[in-house]
Amino acid sequence: MKYTQTTLDKLEAVVEEAGYVLRYERGSFQSGYCILEERKVVVLNKFLQTEGRINTMLDLIPQLEINTDLLSDESKRKYKEVLLKFETEEK
C-alpha cells in the first residue's frame, strides 16, 4: 500500500461511509487514535503525518463494526484489502 494522500482519502472514505465521524484533534493517544463506539466517532492525533495517519487507519479499521452494505464498491475493495493486510500481519 502506498503512503500517499490518495490512499489516506480512500481509508477515510471507508470509515465515513460506514457511518463514523472522523476527526483529527490534539490529545494524548498512546495508539494515535481513540474510538467512541456509542457515538460512532473516531478521533485521530492531528499531529501525525500522512504515513502515520495511514498506519493508524490500518490498525483502526479492523476494530470497527462496519456494515459493508453501506460502502461504495471502491470502499468495499479498500476495506477488504485492509482486512487482508491485517490478517496477514496477525499470522
Named regions from a protein language model:
Residues V14-V15, V21, V41-V43, V82:
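Extended aliphatic helical segments
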Residues R26-E51:
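Active-site scaffold of zinc-dependent metalloenzymes
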Residues V41-L44, I61-E65:
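Short, low-complexity, polar/charged sequence segments that are solvent-exposed and flexible
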